[in-house]
């Protein structure tokens, strides 16, 4: 286990240890923008793999891959929210082992599953010699805490530590010791239990509000996990000119924020929509905010 200054540093370490400039990598599409930009900065050839309700689409994996890394968020695919079944995880591990492909497992939102028990990480299912597992405390505690970690196979421990020391040096000890004590005294588990209950209530509230106020405008993707939802715009409205970029811009005038779903795609966006975080929104404000969103979308439609 290597402690890092956030999950993004862990990604950069893995890239520098495993890849050369120009190597091909496989990323979920749509997927995490920060991951994509990290590989672009290393001049990698990026190939997108589509995702569905069960996360990454196994059938879309190349039969004879030339890429060196496959990046996955199996616990809660970002941004679409799909949760990868155990059988799919095992099949991907087998595919990677047979083809000499590294797996970069981003354990995004693993702590916040509301309607089912989390499945074991791919790193813990065997064949660990090709899996680099990345996690972070930023989302479960607070964003300003830049404290992450990576679990790496024995053969890359030394190069990963060397690379980390070269690019960033030591991770601040005060934060490490504070979090370690927080965990050891049982506060971390109590915090997760409390926040899981709170976020579950917010999750149910925002889903209900979207279904009530956004009928025929947008449909919420409901996976029972995480601190955000994805709203998929009605395709007919998009064909008529509704744009998620315009909606996000108009939302700012009402002090509301969201991310346009189209920006998470590598190339042409297959769907328009919004990535809506709810963790820092008061429970009582969720319904009125969704009503405001409805008015914003209707206004954008009349102006197209």
Question: What residue ranges belong to the model's regions?
Answer:
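Conserved core of the PLP fold type I
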Residues: 1-99, 111-112, 117-132, 199, ...
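Conserved PLP-binding active-site segment of the aspartate aminotransferase-like
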Residues: 152, 230-239, 257-298
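Conserved glycine-rich beta-strand-loop-beta hairpin in the small C-terminal domain of fold type I
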Residues: 1, 197-207, 218-233
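Short amphipathic alpha-helices in soluble, non-transmembrane regions
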Residues: 244-252, 289-294
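Conserved core segment of the aminotransferase class I/II
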Residues: 127-197
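A non-catalytic, amphipathic alpha-helix used as a structural packing/dimerization or gating element
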Residues: 159-162, 194-205, 288, 292
